[in-house]
């Protein structure tokens, strides 16, 4: 049986009694302020090296297909399962931005100054380039011809659009059938990336 994150046991150390509680995974811990304060159902997307999408309101058991697509249950602070999916977002971003920066001869951090352009974004949405067949082994599709773009900014826009599209597939895995979340909370480094958001 799962133990609530609010359960404590008294133990004695060096003649003193202290209360010791259970630990929870950092992803589960990130849910706590929202579980305590949000009034309506939500889906939490915690971004960093991994993108962890967590739906504490989806109580459906994991299917074989979801397990194959890297879904799992975390436990919330109350010991209840939280349907979650994982996507290697930050790592994919780092690998591809490094490749783009090297090809175009710019600093790795150049992606931070690429501004959002609605027209460029619409063109990027109309095509899939970097992940035509999903995420390739080794994370990079070497058949993508980077010389198709006239600079780092448009290439990055296409990449981040394609990456976001792949990430949304991971988010979709934890939505309830016919019961989409009205509130999506994005935390972590990618919450500051305007092109991702």
Regions found by a protein language model. Name each.
Residues 13-184, 192-197:
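Active-site core segments that coordinate phosphate-bearing ligands/cofactors
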Residues 3-5:
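Gly/charged, well-structured mid-domain segments that form the phosphate/adenylate-handling core
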